[in-house]
Amino acid sequence: MLDGIRYIINRDSNEVWENLIKQTTLASAVETDGVGLHTAVPVHVRLTPAPPDTGYVFRRTDLGGFEIPATVESVAHCGYATTLMRTGVMLSTVEHLLSALRGLGVDNVYIDVDNLEIPILDGSAEVFAEMIEKAGIVSQPLARRALLVREKVAFEQGNRRISVEPGDHYQIDCLIDFPHPMIGVQQFSIDLNNGAFSREIAAARTFGFTDEIEALRRANLIRGGSLDNAIVLTPDGMLNKTGLRFRDEFVRHKILDIIGDLALLGMPILGKVVAERSGHIMHAGLMSKLLRVRSAWDIVDVPETHVQSPRSNVQSLVSAT
């Protein structure tokens, strides 16, 4: 859990806990099988309910249940996927699963996996979202916490940038720019409320370019990649015969990645994320910088009315968490 100041809404009211959004977990366990995008190894993943304040915890069942918490501190590599590590034990390509959990508002889950990479499935978060919906989501007795942004924090590398700024709820605005006839400049904005993730983001697939494939495979990457789990772009089109799921599927997938990577903060964001030509490395850079700028955020209990004005509802300082 992040070190920060916890606020509570209407602390002296007898109805305080009824007016706060509760933490959630799964109602039952759910599982699936697949292969790793980069390793091509078969992998089984099982999601199980977890107690309040657990967050997302990966457990390597092939290593005796060794736990790797899904936190910023666990990030080891973030080139073509986000890889976590704890005391030398790694787990790769976690972002799509974390995106589904955060996008659907699940706070606490144990994720059991029997190999070193989360399965790529169809290249999106749709299968994970369907698993979560099948399992069901239940409320827990403790209030949900969120990272309330108070000051803008930005991270930049050349013409790539990503920032987070104050906002009344979790919003993401993303722009991408690829010199390809099917992409070009695309921009999409989303407010992560009222089922928007399932409707607008979950089905957007990862994508790559044919002129990069051989170099990636020589680097022992994308060995499990295929037309079944990625959009593969030629210089003037795409190899997939099934077409796009959205006209702007590419930028939507970038938002999917942002949600998954920023889930490593351990709680939803009350603020607006703005990304231009971003990627996993940029996301990790923003999170690290944000946590260092202690004046830029607070940890709050989330009121049911947070979409109107969370900052105006914060009344009482109680304790450090």
Segments predicted by a language model, with ranges:
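C-terminal regulatory domains involved in ligand/effector binding and gene-expression control
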Residues: 2-107, 112-321
